UniProtKB/Swiss-Prot annotation:
Belongs to the YbaB/EbfC family. The keyword DNA-binding applies. GO terms for cellular component: bacterial nucleoid; cytosol. Homodimer. This is Nucleoid-associated protein NE0434. It is found in: Cytoplasm, Nucleoid. Binds to DNA and alters its conformation. May be involved in regulation of gene expression, nucleoid organization and DNA protection.
């Protein structure tokens, strides 16, 4: 019984270290969200830090409200992409846990 508990504690510690390492890797990964057929692009890290916003020069001076909507849509697209990449990367860390199919990680 003690051996099983000790083994479980070692596994938990190893997983914690693996998760920390993966979070550091995710911080370096950048994804790009787009809107308006690529006329507005937002680049952010998988820690949700926005690094760049690119707006096609043809949109400058156009309808301000439309431009604001496109920026918001590009940010939302980038957020969805971050979530997808994060889920894929964290799934490799959680692979040994035996979580039920479809369960998102981290919880």
């Amino acid at each position: 019984m003690k051996a099983n508990l000790g083994n479980l504690m070692k596994q938990a510690q190893q997983m914690q270290e693996n998760m920390k390492a993966m979070q550091e890797k995710l911080a370096a990964i950048e994804v790009e969200g787009q809107a308006g057929a690529g006329m507005v692009k937002v680049t952010m890290t998988c820690r949700y830090d926005v690094k760049r916003v690119n707006i096609d020069s043809s949109l400058i001076g156009d309808d301000k409200e439309m431009l604001e909507d496109l920026v918001a849509a590009a940010v939302n697209d980038a957020v969805r992409r971050v979530e997808t990449v994060t889920q894929e990367k964290m799934a490799s860390v959680a692979g040994g846990l035996g979580l039920p199919a479809g369960m998102k990680f981290p919880f």
